[in-house]
Regions:
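Preferential activation on post-signal-peptide N-terminal prodomains/segments
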Residues: 1-226
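A short, compositionally biased
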Residues: 84, 321-323
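Segments that shape or occlude catalytic/ligand-binding pockets
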Residues: 160, 164-321
Length: 326
């Protein structure tokens, strides 16, 4: 909390987002104007298989009219106080009127999850609720971000993140990877809109200079719906950064490092590793559909890292880290 919001005021979500009578009346007036103009699908949700509108504007109007009856004339903000070990969510309002969602939780396979996401820019300009940061996907539909379009260099972004990590008191995770990132939201017509470019910066636990391998999966998934095993979510620390600073942060499931199981472990030679990879790459992709046969895989880096080995049938709360080539 102090690392990000030492100067912020924290308010409960319910008190911050409650709709006043004036706000609800504005929404009702807009919906009723749509009806008067014959626009029964103002959000372009379309129709179902029977030709009926997916969005029922009349039902929505009725719901807002009911909300209006009990809505307050003005908001009364309630201060929020984080409590360790319990679910907590709030809005953090900064001195420059920018705002952040702030959530702490512990549930299921997540021993700890801390999430921060900007909700409003400086001056209080709201960011669409469905806006989310994601990695640049090298899609032909997306223009690749550049340092110029972001307005911030990678080194500057790394420095901002490093300062926050130090304030968080995290010393056993280090910078491991980065990628360009884009912030997207769906417009009123359900088309995707770009709300900015930035960087994704990841930190990973590093032991004697070797990082724990970062994976696309977050862990915590069952092998199948009938599985009864306890799942294990992975440790991660991820930031999205743009010219205005930290836009989003997720910190999950910190590990506790135990004892060394085997001293001086020997790895296969690199040439042997490459032969195994070349063989297994073909085997693991053998059942791909015909059009996948033309896919080309470009390997731009090979890294020594720790792989997580987890045996829930033996112990659902500990695992082993083994050095592997990625």
């Amino acid at each position: 909390t102090n690392a990000f919001f030492s100067e912020a005021k924290l308010y409960t979500m319910d008190s911050y987002y409650v709709k006043t009578k004036d706000e609800i009346k504005k929404t009702l007036d807009e919906l009723k104007e749509d009806v008067a103009n014959g626009n029964l699908d103002p959000y372009n949700y379309g129709t179902d298989d029977d030709g009926n509108y997916v969005y029922d504007i009349y039902e929505d109007i009725e719901t807002w009219e009911q909300e209006y009856e009990t809505a307050p004339e003005k908001k009364t903000l309630t201060e929020a106080k984080p409590v360790a070990g319990n679910y907590f969510s709030c809005i953090a309002q900064m001195p420059d009127d920018s705002q952040y969602y702030y959530m702490i939780s512990s549930d299921g396979s997540d021993t700890l999850s801390v999430k921060i996401k900007k909700a409003a820019n400086k001056g209080g300009e709201k960011i669409p609720e469905d806006a989310m940061w994601c990695d640049y996907g090298y899609s032909e539909e997306e223009e690749k971000p550049t340092e110029e379009s972001i307005g911030l260099s990678l080194d500057e972004a790394k420095k901002l993140v490093k300062e926050k990590v130090e304030k968080m008191g995290i010393t056993d995770l280090q910078f491991s990877n980065w990628n360009y990132a884009v912030c997207k939201s769906f417009e009123g017509d359900n088309s995707s809109g770009n709300f900015g470019n930035g960087y994704r910066i990841d930190y990973a636990r590093t032991i004697n200079g070797v990082p724990v391998t970062q994976t696309i999966a977050d862990g915590g998934a069952l092998e199948d719906m009938d599985s009864t095993m306890e799942t294990w979510s992975y440790e991660s620390l991820c930031f999205y950064v743009d010219k205005d600073g930290i836009e989003s942060m997720t910190y999950s499931n910190p590990y506790t490092i135990g004892n060394i199981k085997t001293e001086n472990l020997n790895l296969l030679s690199f040439s042997e590793i490459m032969k195994i990879y070349e063989k297994m790459m073909v085997v693991t992709n053998a059942d791909n559909m015909q059009y996948e046969n033309s896919r080309v895989y470009n390997i731009d880096r090979i890294v020594l890292g720790y792989a997580r080995i987890y045996e829930p049938s033996t112990d659902a709360h500990t695992g082993i880290l083994i050095p592997v080539w990625d």
